[in-house]
């Protein structure tokens, strides 16, 4: 009897294990199905299953029984390779107690009957499992088909989006530091007063030679601009003078600072002269009062309007105005082209020159060199990029050069065909004062030249401060040598500097910024920037009041400084970094081209000066 009780306990424990195995098998099948289904659609992995999932309850059979129960479980798993789920569910607990010998035959019959039922159920389960696998395969196939359809839809949407990308880029607002805004900065730096003299070049040299020189100067401008931009990226320096100081020495820095400062001042005065002439002509044509069209009054108004723009530290805040400058130049080209046929019909002689060389060749070469001069702001514009990579910078500068070639070729050709050999050095002067379309172009050109002043000031400001600091330090050293034993030295040092403890110490480069040449030229020093802007504006206005025919003087010295800025110094930078180019033919061909333009630029400035003087 005791043995029967032990057997019953064992059977109960075994039945519990079997029931747990049944539950496990059900849960595991459901989990496997869900896992496969989810993996196909949502990509859920086993590592992402939560704590409450069936996967975490697989091995929890009967923890209350202890180690013996675990041993029984493992034995049953090893002995029974296959367990029929349905037979385990339908089979009742076996009663092994023999109450009488009569029940032996019944038990034997029950055993055979149960064995037969198990075979039938196994066949049914195999069919069900086969059908189940077929259904899962269908589900997988359907899911794959759905995924393929979804991918096709996404691909079609991406294709449509890429087709619309150029429209979105063309009409979306400019982002500061983007490729388009940087292209506009390059264009506004290069396209300026020199545009109005391009038709004069065509009249002096002919159409073919003028186009050849335009292409050559565009090639030179692209090479030198690319040299400056890539050198700025390589050394992480975005001021022209600082870049030359690192590659060469401090004398190169002083030279470029002087060249950039003088070029900006001369350009400022020239813009004031042209804007004053155009506005006075417009106001006089529309019968404004005489005091409004007065030269001094117009100059004061222009200076008061341009001062707040020069106080800005970053160029991104005036991007919209720079786009308007390009619009005004485009309008001028269209107006000249629209009237070219009419003015050409008025000419008595219609002799079109294709190729000719005369004494004005060097002067015309200088004009084209000025027109493509965007190198002065190349380092500054490179520093304005939000992602200054080589690909983005090259894309921006190449686009600007291409647009300049198109503008100059069209404007020069249309302007030359309008007046042929009677074309003046400023084509606007060929039109009568009552021409309304030209008056409108004059007004828009005034706006374009007006916004070129703050652009060039922001780029030239570090060079002006660096030049001022170097001159001040030289004066301090000179007085320190002359008056070392003089009692007036302390009072003089107090006048020059507030630092009485170390009055003759030179300023050094600021390690916290790379866009300033001295510690005084940091962007947060707004007071110093305002003082410099006011001083420069007053100086240029004073010169414009007293000298109205400064164009020849500016052409001589401006051409000389432009040759240094655009040809000689980029050539020096390329010569220092020439070892980085592996192709020797490309290396020496580029060096020869830069040397040619450097020599021609200097010779052109000298010859132009002699022609003007004599």
Curated annotation (Swiss-Prot):
Compartments reported by the entry: Vacuole membrane
Phenotypic consequence of gene deletion: Growth of the asexual-stage parasites and maturation of male gametocytes are delayed. Parasites are less virulent, their growth does not result in the development of cerebral malaria and causes less neuronal inflammation and cerebral complications. Asexual-stage parasites have swollen food vacuoles containing altered range of hemoglobin-derived peptides and less hemozoin crystals that are also thinner. Swollen vacuoles are also detectable in the male and female gametocytes. Parasites exhibit lower sensitivity to quinolines.
Keywords: Amino-acid transport, Membrane, Transmembrane, Transmembrane helix, Transport, Vacuole
Primary localisation category: membrane
MF terms (GO), sorted A to Z: L-arginine transmembrane transporter activity; L-glutamate transmembrane transporter activity; L-histidine transmembrane transporter activity; L-lysine transmembrane transporter activity; L-serine transmembrane transporter activity; L-tyrosine transmembrane transporter activity
Highest taxon of the lineage: Eukaryota
Membrane association type: Multi-pass membrane protein
Segments crossing the lipid bilayer: 184-216, 222-243, 255-275, 295-311, 318-340, 360-380, 401-417, 437-459, 531-547, 553-575, 587-613
Entry-linked InterPro entries: AA_transpt_TM (IPR013057)
Entry GO CC: vacuolar membrane
Miscellaneous note of the record: Can transport antimalarial drugs.
Protein family membership: Belongs to the amino acid/polyamine transporter 2 family.
PANTHER family for this protein: AMINO ACID TRANSPORTER (PTHR22950), VACUOLAR AMINO ACID TRANSPORTER 5-RELATED (PTHR22950:SF678)
Function comment: Putative amino acid transporter. Involved in maintaining the osmotic homeostasis of the digestive vacuole. Important for the timely development and growth of the asexual-stage parasites and male gametocyte maturation.
Name of protein: Putative amino acid transporter AAT1
């Amino acid at each position: 009897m005791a043995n029967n009780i032990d057997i019953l306990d064992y059977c109960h424990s075994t039945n519990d294990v079997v029931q747990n195995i049944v539950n496990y098998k059900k849960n595991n099948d459901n989990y496997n199905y869900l896992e496969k289904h989810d993996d196909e659609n949502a990509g859920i992995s086993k590592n992402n299953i939560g704590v409450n999932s069936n996967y975490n309850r697989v091995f929890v059979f009967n923890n209350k029984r202890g180690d013996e129960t675990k041993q029984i479980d493992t034995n049953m798993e090893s002995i029974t390779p296959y367990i029929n789920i349905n037979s385990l569910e339908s089979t009742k607990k076996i009663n092994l107690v023999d109450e009488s010998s009569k029940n032996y035959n019944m038990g034997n019959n029950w055993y055979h009957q149960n064995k037969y039922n198990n075979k039938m159920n196994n066949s049914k389960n195999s069919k069900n499992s086969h059908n189940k696998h077929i259904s899962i395969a269908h589900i997988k196939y359907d899911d794959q088909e759905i995924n393929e359809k979804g991918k096709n839809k996404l691909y079609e949407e991406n294709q449509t989006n890429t087709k619309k990308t150029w429209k979105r880029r063309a009409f979306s607002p400019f982002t500061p530091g983007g490729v388009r805004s940087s292209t506009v900065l390059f264009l506004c730096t290069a396209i300026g007063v020199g545009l109005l003299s391009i038709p004069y070049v065509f009249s002096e040299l002919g159409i073919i030679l003028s186009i050849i020189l335009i292409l050559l100067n565009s090639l030179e401008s692209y090479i030198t601009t690319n040299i400056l931009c890539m050198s700025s990226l390589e050394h992480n320096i975005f001021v022209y003078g600082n870049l030359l100081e690192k590659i060469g020495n401090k004398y190169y820095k002083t030279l470029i600072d002087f060249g950039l400062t003088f070029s900006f001042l001369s350009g400022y005065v020239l813009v004031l002269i042209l804007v004053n002439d155009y506005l006075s002509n417009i106001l006089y044509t529309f019968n404004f009062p005489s005091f409004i069209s007065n030269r001094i009054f117009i100059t004061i108004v222009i200076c008061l309007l341009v001062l707040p723009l020069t106080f800005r530290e970053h160029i991104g805040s005036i991007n919209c105005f720079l786009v308007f400058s390009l619009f005004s130049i485009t309008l001028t080209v269209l107006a000249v082209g629209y009237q070219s046929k009419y003015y050409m019909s008025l000419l008595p002689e219609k002799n079109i020159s294709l190729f000719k060389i005369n004494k004005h060749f060097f002067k015309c070469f200088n004009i084209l060199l000025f027109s493509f001069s965007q190198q002065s702001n190349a380092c500054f514009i490179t520093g304005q990029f939000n992602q200054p990579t080589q690909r983005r910078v090259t894309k921006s500068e190449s686009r600007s050069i291409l647009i300049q070639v198109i503008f100059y070729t069209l404007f020069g050709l249309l302007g030359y065909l309008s007046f042929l050999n009677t074309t003046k050095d400023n084509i606007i002067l060929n039109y009568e004062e009552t021409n309304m379309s030209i008056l409108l172009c004059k007004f828009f050109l005034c706006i374009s030249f007006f916004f070129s002043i703050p652009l060039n000031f922001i780029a030239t400001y570090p060079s002006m401060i660096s030049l001022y600091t170097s001159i001040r330090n030289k004066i301090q050293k000179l007085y320190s040598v002359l008056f070392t034993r003089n009692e007036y030295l302390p009072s003089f040092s107090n006048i020059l500097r507030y630092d009485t403890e170390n009055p003759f110490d030179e300023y050094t480069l600021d390690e916290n910024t790379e866009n300033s040449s001295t510690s005084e030229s940091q962007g947060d020093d707004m007071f110093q920037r305002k003082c410099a802007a006011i001083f420069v504006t007053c100086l240029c206005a004073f010169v414009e009041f007293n000298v109205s025919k400064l164009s020849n003087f500016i052409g001589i010295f401006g051409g000389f400084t432009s040759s240094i800025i655009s040809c000689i110094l980029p050539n020096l930078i390329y010569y220092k970094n020439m070892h980085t180019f592996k192709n020797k033919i490309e290396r020496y061909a580029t060096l020869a081209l830069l040397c040619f333009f450097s020599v021609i630029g200097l010779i052109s400035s000298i010859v132009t000066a002699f022609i003007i003087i004599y």
